[in-house]
Amino acid sequence: NTTTTRPSNRFGGINFAALNKENGCRKAFIPENNKFVEIDISAYHPTLAAHLVGYKFDTDDIHASFAKMYNVDYKKAKELTFKQLYGGVFKQYKDLEFFQKVQKYVDELWEKFNTDGYIECMISKYRFEKDKLDNMNPQKLFNYLLQNLETSLNVRIMKHIIKRIINKKSKLVLYVYDSFLFDLADDEEYLIEDIKNIFKRYKLKVKLKHGTNYDFE
């Protein structure tokens, strides 16, 4: 695991989170069963941040909500939100309600960290302790908390998934941050709907990709 408690996603010397999507190397990974199905969580960190700060989006499509707030296209909105959640709020967007709430939460988190000497994560109860972390700042601390929440929630989700697919031909073969890759047998396609319902239980929106290799062709 990394300092933030997030998995490193390295196995056998390969960083699966950083596999190139353009040069065709993903085609080398093929399923033992009939196909790969990847379930991706949409807007994972904005969803978690909204939960932490008590903000409700006006639509299920969070990136579309941000595009409307910023008055930019969908792709640009995703980029802007990612940069601000990890690097701090841009001056021109600091008056948006979502980022006002985020900033208030970050400030309070930082005050607690300095007063108590630690913060405790809500699901895992893991503590980020001040005397064990170098060069910490408010935004970095918030990022650590987000990544721990993501990892803790994913562990819970995977426990449910494993219970559902145990003794099946289909397997969960890879987990990378916000995506779960399944090696799916043709006669077990019904499992995907069951697995989607697990994410729904946690109010997470997902999208699916499938193919006969990891490039989804």
Predicted regions and their residues:
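Conserved catalytic core of nucleic-acid polymerases
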Residues: 68-175, 202-206, 210-212, 216-217
